[in-house]
Amino acid sequence: MTSCNLTAQDIQLPEPTRKGGMPLMEAINNRHSSREFSDATLTNQQLSDMLWATCGYNRPDKRTVATALNRQEMSAYIVTPEAIYKYEPKENKLIHITSGDHRDVFAAQDFAKNAPLNVALVADLAKQDKKEFAGMTVGAMSNNIYLWCASEGLNTVTRASFNQEGMKKAMKLSETEEVLLVQTVGKK
């Protein structure tokens, strides 16, 4: 996954980079889907930047993506060959959920089963009673991942082919939490 040693513990990520990068219009122009990924891993800085862009805090109690009524019902989990982690945006930290390679549960396609990183976007429907609102938020989260990947010269693709029940079990989700989308991310 990253340049750090992976163990069955939480990982404090470095402060996300909030300035610089590719100009927005250039990132939009470069945005694309790709199903080709090397086995090279992202650095902790890249993970921090991507997850902050996905659903981090950019001002007090407000996220980088809009959430209807500011319910903030969405979470991001990362799935690596070594473990599953939940992103804790207030602390910019990865919370260890479980060890082991669970990528086969998160993907029906071979390219995603072998990719070094999958990002699962999860809605807690107890916080947001309208699934359509959660869908709006997950769309914004996914788009931020696409734009960040374009800015970094990385590949990504959004996927809806996954084992919902297997993922819920592997990620230890509650009854009210549901995976809405999975996005594979990696180097070319």
What is the predicted role of each segment?
Residues M1-N5, I145:
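Domain-scale selection of a single, long terminal region
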Residues C4, G135, G139, V185-G186:
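Glycine-centered structural positions embedded in regular secondary structure
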Residues C4-A115:
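N-terminal amphipathic, basic helical "cap/leader" segment at the start of enzyme domains
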Residues Q9-D10, D129-K131, K187:
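A short, structure-level motif marking secondary-structure boundaries and short turns
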Residues T17, L121-L125, K187:
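Short, small-residue-rich loop/turn micro-motifs
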Residues R31, M50, A76, L117-A170:
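Small-aliphatic-rich amphipathic alpha-helix that forms the alpha element of a beta-alpha
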Residues K172-K188:
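A glycine-rich helix N-cap at a beta->alpha junction
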